[in-house]
Amino acid sequence: MAFNLRNRNFLKLLDFTPKEIAHLLELSAELKKAKYSGYEQPRLTGKNIALIFEKSSTRTRCAFEVAAFDQGAKVTYLGPSGSQIGHKESMKDTARVLGRMYDGIEYRGFGQTIVEELGQYAGVPVWNGLTDEFHPTQILADFLTMQEYANGKQLSQITFAYLGDARNNMGNSLMVGAAKMGMEIRLVAPKQFWPEEELVTQCQEIALQTGAKIVLTEEVTEGVKGCDFLYTDVWVSMGEAPEAWDERVALMTPYQINMDVIKATENPNVKFMHCLPAFHNDETTLGKEIAEKYGMNGLEVTEDVFESEYSIVFDEAENRMHTIKAVMVATLGS
């Protein structure tokens, strides 16, 4: 079934129906196959795209740029120091200026209200590259990756667990995505790190319509048993104070994904996922500081899991580009 998403914003998965999300995933798979097969047809030729990054990025920026280039579009990158947004010019005014010059706008930054305002006033499609509350393009990549590794299961037949800080944009977005697609998600975290009650209630209401199951638990063994996928993210998110580390590490250490947790799934085919970057060894400046301060070689995931046959994080990272391409083509393409 064809769907017309032209001129739609892509700000959060709550705005989309399960069938629309499934359409974007199907289009992602088609575009990925076309790129690999060498017969990709540009559908964004002549389009100009603005990429607003108020937070730094590797995967999201590269994914948007390569996806745009593949499809014939040109991009302008506006980094944290490259615009007047919020300093000398309001987002409302910026939206109306950029909307006159560009055919589509990506935003990666802080509050969800900011990207919502951009979407309200730009007059062209606006895509959320990450906010404090939601990370919808990451979820499309995650679900495409799950489909590729699910051994024939539909999304609605998949059970997965998210361990760690479940109140951040990834916990929120995975819960919304699972609710929309009829999946079973288990948020395994200290209670104070569960998503906001209002969002949980909203997702539970969606789950009643889709057959999804949302479980919140503090028990790791209970949470991971029988899972098809285990997912985690960093324990301290972008923008949080360094002083938060001590308390956070103490609270989160029981939720580290290590080989014992892998075994606790009782599923030899379980796969490990992470939106990246990950603290899994001491080969980075921050990783080395963590190892020295806490005596841990890896935080949210251990090196042996990250580099194991269970890990599909780099397929997941690649799929950022294919799914972002699908969003741009669906909302802007000819």
Curated annotation (Swiss-Prot):
Cited Pfam families: OTCace, OTCace_N
Enzyme Commission code(s) on record: 2.1.3.3
PROSITE patterns named among the record's database cross-references: CARBAMOYLTRANSFERASE (PS00097)
GO BP annotations, alphabetical order: arginine biosynthetic process via ornithine; citrulline biosynthetic process; L-arginine biosynthetic process
Binding site for carbamoyl phosphate: 57-60, 84, 108, 135-138, 275-276, 320
Binding, L-ornithine: 169, 233, 237-238
Keywords assigned: Amino-acid biosynthesis, Arginine biosynthesis, Cytoplasm, Transferase
Catalytic reaction(s) noted: carbamoyl phosphate + L-ornithine = L-citrulline + phosphate + H(+)
GO molecular function: amino acid binding; ornithine carbamoyltransferase activity
One term under GO cellular component: cytoplasm
Protein task: Reversibly catalyzes the transfer of the carbamoyl group from carbamoyl phosphate (CP) to the N(epsilon) atom of ornithine (ORN) to produce L-citrulline.
UniProt record similarity statement: Belongs to the aspartate/ornithine carbamoyltransferase superfamily. OTCase family.
Protein name (Swiss-Prot/TrEMBL): Ornithine carbamoyltransferase
Protein's gene: argF
